[in-house]
């Protein structure tokens, strides 16, 4: 099953396709085996920061491990966060990374332009969506600011952020963004927190996050495409079920 078909089917049935990151290469085998044992459709994924700052080695290394253990009925391979501006606020030459992913056999890719202006994010995402579709794979994009990668996840006043909806995906921007970019899935900011990766806070405990369920419903209605939740670990379980 193609990733695009799997996610669309899950969306239509009001369920999810879970995705598991591989920051350390030996995780690929047990994650793939667990997915197959459970007979559920799920993704293995790796983000750029996981070969830059952790031990997944490269997107090609993860793909090589994936294809040793995968089952096409259940497992999918996704390239997670490829930022245009990374967590250290440096510009990334992102297109060659996406091209490598296509060659390695990834079924979907994510471009993260969330640190760009809205206009730049739209233009960049449109470019990547066209590239992905020309190669027969799906494109995920991000709009809004999911906290945590820069270290804010451990020290933030979470209650204040949730109350004010700071960084949450704007409804009107989301409607325009999806219409103009052609992305297949949209990663949204609705209360979750990325794990912090900055030195000094990496090992601190995340706050227990929750989700703004009404905001999710509004975003789903206004965009008309599947939404993606990042920072899923540490969220109140009932919020996950409700979302």
PLM region spans:
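Short acidic/histidine-rich active-site segments
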Residues: 231-235
């Amino acid at each position: 099953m193609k990733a695009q078909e799997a996610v669309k089917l899950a969306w239509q049935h009001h369920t999810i396709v879970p995705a598991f990151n591989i920051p350390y290469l030996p995780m690929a085998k047990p994650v793939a085996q667990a997915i197959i044992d459970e007979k559920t459709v799920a993704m293995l994924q790796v983000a750029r920061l996981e070969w830059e700052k952790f031990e997944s080695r490269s997107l090609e290394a993860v793909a090589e491990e994936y294809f040793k253990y995968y089952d096409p009925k259940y497992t999918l391979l996704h390239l997670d966060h490829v930022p245009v501006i990374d967590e250290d606020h440096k510009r990334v030459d992102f297109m060659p990374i996406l091209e490598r992913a296509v060659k390695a056999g990834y079924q979907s890719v994510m471009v993260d332009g969330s640190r760009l202006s809205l206009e730049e994010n739209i233009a960049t995402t449109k470019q990547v969506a066209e590239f992905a579709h020309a190669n027969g794979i799906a494109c995920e994009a991000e709009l809004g600011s999911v906290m945590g990668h820069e270290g804010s996840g451990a020290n933030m006043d979470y209650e204040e952020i949730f109350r004010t909806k700071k960084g949450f995906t704007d409804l009107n921007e989301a409607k325009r963004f999806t219409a103009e970019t052609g992305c297949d899935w949209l990663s949204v900011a609705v209360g979750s927190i990325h794990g912090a990766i900055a030195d000094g806070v990496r090992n601190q405990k995340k706050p227990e996050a929750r989700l703004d369920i009404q905001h999710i419903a509004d975003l789903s209605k206004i965009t008309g495409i599947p939404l993606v939740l990042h920072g899923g670990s540490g969220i109140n379980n009932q919020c996950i079920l409700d979302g």
